[in-house]
Amino acid sequence: MVRYVDLITDAVQSGRKDDAAQSPASAIPESFFSRAAQAPAVKEPDSDRDVYLALWKQMQSIKAGIREKTGFDILPLKEQVRAIAGSPDLLDRLYHYTTRFGNEEDYTASHSINTMIYALKIALRLEYAPEDLEALGLAALLHDVGMFAVPDSILLKPEPLSPGEAEAVRRHPEAGRDTLAPWSGEMPWLAQTAFEHHELEDGSGYPRGIRGEQISEFAKIVGLASTYEAMTHDRPHRRCVSVRELIDTKNRSFSPRVMRAFLEQISLYPLGSLVRLNNRTLGRVVRTHAGQPLRPVVQIMEDADGNRVAEDRTVNLLGNPILWVTGA
C-alpha cells in the first residue's frame, strides 16, 4: 500500500531536481507599478473579512460588466492585490477565509479569490520578487474571467453537462484571453495565464495541449492553485473530493517545482477538512504548518468511541510524533 508520506517525499524530491533558477515568463514593465501607485487611495478595510468581501464585490462587478457587455476596470484590483501580496501576514489570515467562501452556489468569484490566495502562497515559497507576486496575484484573480460569460444555467447545473454545454465551458480559456486582450500591451501575462491555466505539464491539457517549458510559470502556478481550489470546495454537480491525486507521483500533470512549493506551503489536508487520527479520534483541521503538509493542527470533535467531545481540545501534530492522520 502506498502511504501519503511516501507520495509527499517523492513529490518533494522530484521538485528539487527541477529547481533550477526560473523566473516568470513575462517581464513586468515599470509602468504597471507606477500607474498603480498613482491610483486613487482605497479605503482601509475594517477587517480581514472586509478585504475578502471587497475583492468578491469587485469580481462580481467584473462578471456583470462581461455579461452585460459594459466593460470593466481592473485598476481597483491592482491596489487590492498589491496590499495582499505585500503582506504575508494578511495573506495567511485570508487563507483561513478560503474555507468559508467557495461552497456557495454561485462560486465563480470566490473561486478566483481563493485561487489567488493559494497562488500567492506558492509563489512566496518560490521566493518571487514583490513585483512578480503582484503580477501573479492579478493574473490569478482574472484567470477565469472566461467563465463569467458562461450562462448560469450551465455553471450552476447540478446534473452532468451535455456535450454542447461541456464544450461551452471548455472554451473559457480562449474567452478569457480575448476578454483580457485590451491589456495585452501593458500586461501580456494576464491573457497568457487565462489562456494557459488548463495546460498540463505532460501535454494532456487544453486548449493547445502544450507541455513543460512551453507553459508559462504563472499559468502552472495558477493551474495548480485553481485545481486545488475546485477539488476542495463543493460544486453544484458534486461534493468536494480528495486531493490525493494532486501529489500522486504517477500524475505528471503539474510542474515538480511548483508542486514542491505547493506541498511545502499548503497542507495536504485543507483547512476545515475532517481527519481521522491513528488513535481513532475524529477532528477538524484548524491550522497548517508551512513545510509540514502531513502535520496540521486538529480540533478533536469525536473520541475513539465516536462520542462528541464537549471541551475545546486541539492537537498540534507537529509536536506529537506519536499521532498522525490515517484517513481524510
Name what the model sees in each region.
Residues 1-75:
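Membrane-cytosol interface segments
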Residues 47-328:
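Histidine- and acidic-residue-rich, metal-dependent catalytic cores
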